[in-house]
């Protein structure tokens, strides 16, 4: 298995990232968050996020399939000069295969100009 880490660029990649976001959100939080809250995180909402915020998102591809993503950027508190990792999600079938580590390393490289990175 060769995983490719790259910027999210095409409509197919945006759709793939949206599906990963929705599926992994359910897998991670279904037993933690109330059902009424979970029901608000729809595939359409994930599509909206992916389309509205395509910049600073790296995807992990297994062949042409999106299997994970990381979103990063400037820390949300402008009083603090730092980079931030906003989201990191990997499909359950890819746990333990180093995909999350590859995504984090790529995000750290993209945030290289910062002395501090906040998770």
What are these regions (language model features)?
Residues 7-93, 104-106, 110:
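Acetyl-CoA-dependent GNAT
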